[in-house]
Amino acid sequence: MSTIEGTAPAGSSTAGRPAPAPARSTLRKRIFGSGEKPGFLTYGLLLAFLLSSAYPLWWSAVIGSRSNEALGETWPPLLPGGNFWTNVGEVFDTIPFWLALGNSVLISCIITVSVVGFSTLAGYAFAKLRFKGRNGLMLMVVATMAIPTQLGIIPLFMVMRTLGWTGEIGAVVVPTLVTAFGVFFMRQYLVDVIPDELIESARMDGASMISTFRHVAIPAARPAMAILGLFTFMTAWTDFLWPLLVLDAGNPTLQTALSQLQSARYVDYSVVLAGAVLATLPLLVLFVLAGKQLISGIMQGAVKG
């Protein structure tokens, strides 16, 4: 028997050829993304978030480089003017800027080093050491986070006055040498990042408790220490109420000194915002220098989660 083989007409599709992807699906992937590749919408939202976050600082710099009359214009200015250094000179003439800057740097650095050091020690103890009452003590630490800071200002001020510390830098530093949030944050990080087997192995090799903490816990906790350090420095740098209560007007921090630029009858907002821009620059420099550690810590936390 002979078989008759037919040929498909020209222009007809073969049975095994895959159908082309729909154009609608391709457009959806470009907009919303697919898998690990973000889409246009993701980039658009990130850009909008970036602009909304950077605009207040940019607007402060614009008004700080102009006169006070710029606030009354119908359309707010978007480009800097030429009065920035004039306003900066007014800031230097009105407040003890360099003294306030030195106080803020000193206070923020001492508080940051103390909080990071004590929090890492306490967090490691709560996470990896077994001792009686550990869970109860940790519960007390967490419970203090629910108490508003303003509730303890009056009793704390009375203690500082009894000790004779009012007007001194120590009155600002001592109450914040360690924080409940720092202890809780480091404990939650170290409880997952350091395996118990690694600590037992170090003990079997003859390492002491201090040596284990130094060579095992600290290297593993560096990303979290960087994040806690940045957060603590920023909190100490921007603190206003407590330094205002315990420090004299002649020995201020940068935030309390900026409040001296305002008077009861007239406020030159261009001078105030010029001072605010100067006070923000150290934080921006810190974030630029420590940005790599910050991103590393966030990424490690995301991978563990």
Task: Kindly label every feature range from the protein language model.
Residues S2-S34:
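Short, Lys/Arg-rich, polar N-terminal cytosolic tail immediately upstream
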